[in-house]
């Protein structure tokens, strides 16, 4: 016999925070740690002087990947303003030093110059936990905090932000 109160409580929790129920852990602990460390990185740690509250200094994109390998369905692109381009794979592998590619670094600089245009369609959030999705999840960090948007392609600014991201991934031969 199914307890209707238990079902009602679960549905209520799901409606309040769907991300709890979407967090399918087909990712390694190392991946989660690398990803969270990137999201926790502050402009103070970088000794960076930001010009305004809309200047983005960190961009993190969780990108779904077509893969038959369990634990390898997501890759995260991490861009640190003027410094680094990294890719973290859900299985825990990390590819670093991609900023050595001059074209990739130029694409990253273009992203940081242009991505603040998308902030007004994003949500300032404290929730950065990983979850699976068929869409790219974008996190842009400013002095005010982390802005989030799941890129569904519904708006011009979403498509623009995804295009900026793909310009970087194409230069580092990232396979989605």
Please identify what each model-predicted range represents.
Residues 100-108, 112, 158-166:
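Short, charged, low-complexity patches
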Residues 2-61, 132-176:
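Short, well-ordered, aromatic-rich surface patches in folded extracellular/luminal domains
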Residues 62-73, 142-144:
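Short, flexible beta-strand-to-coil junctions
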Residues 63-65, 92-93, 102-105:
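Long, positively charged binding patches that form subdomain-scale interaction surfaces
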Residues 103-135:
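Short, internal acidic amphipathic alpha-helical interface segments
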């Amino acid at each position: 016999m199914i307890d209707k109160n238990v079902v009602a409580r679960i549905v209520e929790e799901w409606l309040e925070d769907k991300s709890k129920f979407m967090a399918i852990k087909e990712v390694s602990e190392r991946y989660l740690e690398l990803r969270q460390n990137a999201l926790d990185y502050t402009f103070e740690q970088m000794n960076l002087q930001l010009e305004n509250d809309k200047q983005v200094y960190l961009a993190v994109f969780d990108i779904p990947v077509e893969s038959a390998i369990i634990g390898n369905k997501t890759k995260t692109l991490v861009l640190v303003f003027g410094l680094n381009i990294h890719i973290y794979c859900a299985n825990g592998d990390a590819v670093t030093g991609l900023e050595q590619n001059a074209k990739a670094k130029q694409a990253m600089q273009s992203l940081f110059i242009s991505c603040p245009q998308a902030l007004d369609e994003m949500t300032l959030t404290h929730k950065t936990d990983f979850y699976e999705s068929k869409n790219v999840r974008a996190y842009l960090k400013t002095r005010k905090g982390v802005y989030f948007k799941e890129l569904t392609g519904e708006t011009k600014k979403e498509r623009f932000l995804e295009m900026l991201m793909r310009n970087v991934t194409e230069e580092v031969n990232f396979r989605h």
